[in-house]
Amino acid sequence: MDKLTDLNYTLSVITLMNSTLHTILEDPGMAYFPYIASVLTVLFTLHKASIPTMKIALKTSKCSYKVVKYCIVTIFNALLKLAGYKEQITTKDEIEKQTDRVVKEMRRQLEMIDKLTTREIEQVELLKRIHDKLMIRAVDEIDMTKEINQKNVKTLEEWENGKNPYEPKEVTAAM
């Protein structure tokens, strides 16, 4: 903790990096190296300065770590979008939310599949029972007179006086 907050330590590391970089720079083939080195120096300084500042800010402001992490992730995502990247940084909380959502959807799908399979099994059993009932009866045992309502039908010889009772009769009405 002392090394993280010690400004002298940070300055000595920066001085060491700069002296190392200047010795490397004497080579004429390293034209773009100073730009890379300056970016690395700035990043290292930001890293060393942000950790103690973040710890002090968390203790004094009493805001949660998740809020600060969310703010930092949002800032980095905005910077990535400005730079033209389509990728985004996600936190563990977002990943856990997404996995929970996927697991919930998978459970719902499994319940749906279970319901559908039980319905299909019931339908197959019903079809089997219908098939068994159809296969048990022989065709010549079925009395078709019940099916076409011909049980009480009389033939021409059985009609009274030989007249067809279904023929229309003349009806006269008084006016």
UniProtKB/Swiss-Prot annotation:
The keyword Ion transport applies. Residues 52-175 are cytoplasmic. It is found in: Host rough endoplasmic reticulum membrane; Host membrane, Host caveola; Secreted. The N-glycosyl content is primarily Man(9)GlcNAc, with a small amount of Man(8)GlcNAc. The keyword Ribosomal protein does not apply. GO terms for cellular component: extracellular region; host caveola; host cell rough endoplasmic reticulum membrane; membrane. Pfam families: Rota_NSP4 (PF01452). GO terms for molecular function: channel activity; metal ion binding; toxin activity. It is a single-pass type III membrane protein. Keywords: Activation of host autophagy by virus, Calcium, Enterotoxin, Glycoprotein, Host endoplasmic reticulum, Host membrane, Host-virus interaction, Ion channel, Ion transport, Membrane, Metal-binding, Secreted, Signal-anchor, Toxin, Transmembrane, Transmembrane helix, Transport, Viral ion channel, Virulence. One of its GO terms (biological process) is symbiont-mediated activation of host autophagy. Its main location: host cell. Ca(2+) binds at E120, Q123. InterPro entries: Rotavirus_NSP4. Glycans are attached at N8, N18. The chain crosses the membrane at residues 29-51. Residues 1-28 are lumenal. Binds 1 calcium ion per tetramer. Plays an essential role in the virus replication cycle by acting as a viroporin. Creates a pore in the host endoplasmic reticulum and as a consequence releases Ca(2+) in the cytoplasm of infected cell. In turn, high levels of cytoplasmic calcium trigger membrane trafficking and transport of viral ER-associated proteins to viroplasms, sites of viral genome replication and immature particle assembly. The secreted form acts as an enterotoxin that causes phospholipase C-dependent elevation of the intracellular calcium concentration in host intestinal mucosa cells. Increased concentration of intracellular calcium disrupts the cytoskeleton and the tight junctions, raising the paracellular permeability. Potentiates chloride ion secretion through a calcium ion-dependent signaling pathway, inducing age-dependent diarrhea. Belongs to the rotavirus NSP4 family. Homotetramer. Interacts with the immature particle in the viroplasm. Interacts with host CAV1, early and late in infection. Interacts with host integrin ITGA1/ITGB1 heterodimer. Interacts with host integrin ITGA2/ITGB1 heterodimer. Interaction with microtubules blocks trafficking to the Golgi apparatus. HAMAP family: ROTA_NSP4. This is Non-structural glycoprotein 4.
